[in-house]
């Protein structure tokens, strides 16, 4: 997945991980050495840690009991409007 594809398909908003916890996608960024698209996101639980994950991995599916499921499913629009910050 290239950067433009990642920006157009992984939109800011609230997502649910296949294991049930929720996260907010903040941005799609570029890796400083490889330019690989990376998803910058934060946990919506606990200390609300901020994480990065390769965009290709974000969009992967996982198999559960023989059925393919998205690793992350978008469940709501962006929580914050970072342009107003």
Which role does the model predict for each range below?
Residues 1-85:
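Mixed-charge, low-complexity intrinsically disordered regions
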